From Swiss-Prot:
Protein family membership: Belongs to the VOPP1/ECOP family.
Keyword Signal tagged: yes
Primary localisation category: membrane
Name the UniProt record assigns to this protein: WW domain binding protein VOPP1
Disordered, as annotated region: 130-168
Function according to Swiss-Prot or TrEMBL: May be involved in the transcriptional activity of NFKB1. May regulate WWOX role as tumor suppressor.
Transmembrane segments: 60-80
Organism: Xenopus laevis
GN (gene name): vopp1
Cytoplasmic side of membrane: 81-168
Annotated localization: Cytoplasmic vesicle membrane; Late endosome membrane; Lysosome membrane
The organism's taxonomic lineage, starting at the top: Eukaryota, Metazoa, Chordata, Craniata, Vertebrata
GO cellular component terms, A-Z: cytoplasmic vesicle membrane; late endosome membrane; lysosomal membrane; organelle membrane
Keywords carried by this UniProt record: Cytoplasmic vesicle, Endosome, Lysosome, Membrane, Signal, Transcription, Transcription regulation, Transmembrane, Transmembrane helix
Amino acid sequence: MKSLHCVGLYLLSLLCQLTEAKKHCWYFEGLYPTYYICRAYEDCCGSRCCVRALSIQRLWYFWFLLMMGVLFCCGAGFFIRRRMYPPLLVDEPTFNVSYTRQPAGPPGGPQQPVMPYYSDPGGAMGNPMTPSFYVQPNSPQGNPPFPPPPSYCNTPPPPYEQVVKSYK
């Protein structure tokens, strides 16, 4: 009975070996080829050695694509960051434009101190080319006190013929 068990196991192992897919490999040793066998999930490497087919070191294209993906993501992130947060402009225009008129103070009275509004973190004092804008400190935010407009603003312009005659 024991021998029948042993023969059965031996035949089963032979059947498993026959059904298992194998790779037949060969290499030249001198002038003659030498043959050897590797398992189905292994590759032949040359001189009677077998290596696993899916070893991560042999997948050069995987590493290449991984590095290209990392570079692409870094480049895209840099581009998006530059578009969403553009760099601060250092060069200011060389001309000085006054956007508000200074209110006329009382003729004999002391002038109120004027607080400068800085257009950049360095301020107008740090950069001589930076125009400074002045705001009255004690005025409401959106309604600074200005003098009334000149009287000629309330009248219609003179006719064209009158202007031409006055210059002749």
